[in-house]
Amino acid sequence: MVDYQGKKVVIIGLGLTGLSCVDFFLARGVVPRVVDTRISPPGLDKLPEQVERHLGSLNEDWLMSADLIVASPGVALATPILCDAADAGIEIVGDIELFCREAQAPIVAITGSNGKSTVTTLVGEMARAAGWQVGVGGNIGLPALQLLEHPAQLYVLELSSFQLETTTSLHAAAATILNVTEDHTNRYPFGLQQYRAAKLHIYEHADLCVVNADDALTMPVRGADARCRSFGVDVGDYHLNRQQGETWLRVDGERVLNTREIKLVGQHNYTNALAALALADAVKIPRASALTALTSFTGLPHRFQMAFERNGVRWINDSKATNVGSTEAALSGLAVDGTLHLLLGGDGKSADFSPLVPYLQGERIRLYCFGRDGQQLAALRPEIAEQTETMEQAMRVIAERIRPGDMVLLSPACASLDQFRSFEQRGDEFARLAEELG
């Protein structure tokens, strides 16, 4: 634990995470200052009166006179004033670093471009099934610092690349990078390797690393070593085994669970299950408890979730697929009896959509592209694509064409903010329209 008494602390960014940092320091007798570039940031009404705040811009005088700067994950370390502060020897951390300095229980740390919320939640459920006191949070649910307020035998943290950039004291009992695909190109101007380098921080000081045997970018820089266990579709210590039309989860050559007993849908979710099982084994969660949790877990909202089914047509809400890799995962190994009606569109964040092309082949697929980058997506295979301005317009076209055995899949490969407040609102709208039109 670190003594912060007498330190001049400035917190950049309010919101839930910023407020958790304020509470953390107040509980230790330190009154921090808060700066936020927004005039009316979320959580402002909950900020205690004694905490000085500067809104609408970054207060350079405060930052350059600080002993410690706690930066929100949304603030790039490349921001000029933070570069100046770092050059001046001022320590810059994030909330996860503060958490790691205080945590007294083992930590399972999970990152990746896609699937991390599902795996984080699933490992937490596995621990609960064993009767453990577990704190689950970080980039999902509760801010990590709030987890310190309750006793825990295990912490399970979802961590973003942004959070890992400001973390040096993480000593995970088990850590994983589930996958690495292009994302956040605005934050990582030097491309995929810069993004991957941020993710790789998770393996530093980890007792055990769980790597994706199908994705070399998830490997530690020095390659797999004695600390590593692997998962994958067909290879890895934890992999899928297909026999006589059935698919099993297999660990070290032993079949442990038939996927028919799992409520999660799709090959990408089966590999998520394998990763969760590997992490659970690493921290000695009893296997029986882990499998019990796995068979009862229904998944997270907006993540390849069945929104509606009628007359043999399934409407699948995968609105959380805000990047190309997520949509690739959804389409990989997807089985549809009839035609797949795929909804793509939104704000692609300057991403390269071409990796989707191999998944868009065949006669039984139709594309419906909408939003800011709808035209670019329709160009991937124009002969089967239809472009509309909005998702609702596209769904009304689909409703006229569906037949029993078809699937309507919203897996947009794009952020939602060009037309929606959030991916959640986009998914809710899809579900509402599915029920109306189905």
Curated annotation (Swiss-Prot):
UniProt-annotated binding residues for ATP: G112, S113, N114, G115, K116, S117, T118
Catalytic EC class: ligase
Gene Ontology process terms (BP): cell division; cell wall organization; peptidoglycan biosynthetic process; regulation of cell shape
UniProt entry keywords in alphabetical sequence: ATP-binding, Cell cycle, Cell division, Cell shape, Cell wall biogenesis/degradation, Cytoplasm, Ligase, Nucleotide-binding, Peptidoglycan synthesis
Reaction(s) the record says it catalyses: UDP-N-acetyl-alpha-D-muramoyl-L-alanine + D-glutamate + ATP = UDP-N-acetyl-alpha-D-muramoyl-L-alanyl-D-glutamate + ADP + phosphate + H(+)
Entries under Pfam families matching the protein: Mur_ligase_C (PF02875), Mur_ligase_M (PF08245), MurD-like_N (PF21799)
Main subcellular location: cytoplasm
Record GO terms (molecular function): ATP binding; UDP-N-acetylmuramoylalanine-D-glutamate ligase activity
GO cellular component: cytoplasm
UniProt subcellular location: Cytoplasm
Stored InterPro entries: Mur-like_cat_sf, Mur_ligase_C, Mur_ligase_C_dom_sf, Mur_ligase_cen, MurD
EC number(s) from the headed UniProt entry: 6.3.2.9
Family: Belongs to the MurCDEF family.
Purpose of the protein: Cell wall formation. Catalyzes the addition of glutamate to the nucleotide precursor UDP-N-acetylmuramoyl-L-alanine (UMA).
HAMAP family: MurD
Name assigned to this protein: UDP-N-acetylmuramoylalanine--D-glutamate ligase
Organism for this UniProt entry: Pectobacterium atrosepticum (strain SCRI 1043 / ATCC BAA-672) (Erwinia carotovora subsp. atroseptica)
Taxonomic lineage from the root: Bacteria, Pseudomonadati, Pseudomonadota, Gammaproteobacteria, Enterobacterales
Gene (name only): murD
